[in-house]
Structures are given as C-alpha cells and as structure tokens.
C-alpha cells in the first residue's frame, strides 16, 4: 500500500476474480487487479497485454514476485503432487512472470530500467524439518534469482531477493 500512498500505479495479481472489486474499492483507482495463476502461462500473457496497454509505452518500474504456498509435513507423507506444486508456484511461477514481463522492465522507454524483487524466506537459506517442499522451492527461487541477477546486469535491471522471517499471513492458515 505504500506504493499506492505515494501515487504509483500498482498492478496486483489475484487468482479469484471475485476479489477484484473489493480490492479496487479498498486500494482505489491506482490499483489494477490482474486475474491469473502464476502457473498458467496463457493467463499471465493476457495480463501482460493488459499492463502493456495501460502503461502505453511507459515501463514497469518494479516486478514483485510473491506467490507462495506452504504445505507442511514429513517427507514420507508429502505427495509428489504437493512437492511439485511448491516448485510450480514459487519457482516456475516466478520464471513465468519474469520471462513474460521482462520486456516492460527495460529502459527503452524510460530513463531508468525496472527492478525485479523476488520474495523468498529464511527457508531459502536454511532447511527446516517438515518443510522440505517449501524450503526446496525457496532454495531454487534464490538460485534462480542469483543467476537472473547476473544475466540482467547488462540491461541494468536489478534483481533483489527479500527473505523475511516468518510472520502471520494467510499462507499459514
């Protein structure tokens, strides 16, 4: 909400279209909800077209990747589908969003290139018992981010990893 308070146009991804109106009402006209699942390349591509149209030649200042899930339990009880869902959401989903939105982050139409912020967690650097799926996906996200950071140096696009410690959010419900 700080970006909105400073007058920036904020695009926020949501999976449930029914949340569009309440979020728009809560955050105001500078909040544009985008309905897509980060694991669905086609949905993200449609959102990209909407953002590109709204920006009308301007660049996207920041891409924040924050999609996540946390299904906890011992490895012997986690299904391969649950493990796969962690990787698809946090790693492949981030890859999808970066790849699709990257053209809007370049400095072609603006004096300064955009930034990519990938939200990790303490689980991205330290494995925890009963969190193998979550920690594995966060480790992979950090590896992807480090590689991307070096790859995008030539374009002066900064890649930032933020790894907050645990705090109460809906992911733990």
Write out the residue ranges for each language-model feature.
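The beta1-alpha1 cofactor-binding region of Rossmann-like NAD(H)/NADP(H)-dependent oxidoreductases
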Residues: 36-49, 80
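Substrate-binding pocket helix/loop in short-chain dehydrogenase/reductase
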Residues: 74-75, 79-84
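Active-site loop immediately N-terminal to the catalytic Tyr-X3-Lys motif
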Residues: 76, 124-133
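Residue(s) in the substrate-gating loop at a strand-loop-helix junction
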Residues: 121
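SDR active-site lid
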Residues: 154-173
């Amino acid at each position: 909400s700080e970006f909105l308070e400073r007058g920036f146009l904020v695009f926020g991804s949501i999976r449930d279209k029914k949340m569009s109106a309440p979020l728009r009402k809560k955050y105001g006209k500078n909040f544009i909800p985008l309905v897509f699942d980060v694991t669905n390349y086609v949905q993200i591509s449609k959102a990209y077209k909407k953002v590109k149209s709204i920006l009308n030649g301007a660049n996207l200042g920041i891409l924040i990747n924050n999609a996540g899930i946390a299904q906890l339990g011992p490895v012997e009880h986690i299904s391969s589908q649950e493990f796969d869902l962690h990787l698809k959401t946090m790693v492949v989903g981030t890859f999808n969003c970066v790849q699709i939105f990257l053209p809007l982050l370049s400095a072609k139409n603006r004096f300064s290139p955009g930034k990519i912020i990938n939200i990790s967690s303490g689980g991205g650097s330290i494995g925890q018992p009963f969190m193998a799926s979550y920690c594995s996906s966060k480790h992979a996200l950090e590896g992807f981010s480090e590689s991307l950071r070096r790859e995008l140096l030539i374009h002066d696009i900064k890649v930032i990893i933020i790894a907050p410690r645990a705090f109460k959010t809906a992911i733990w419900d």
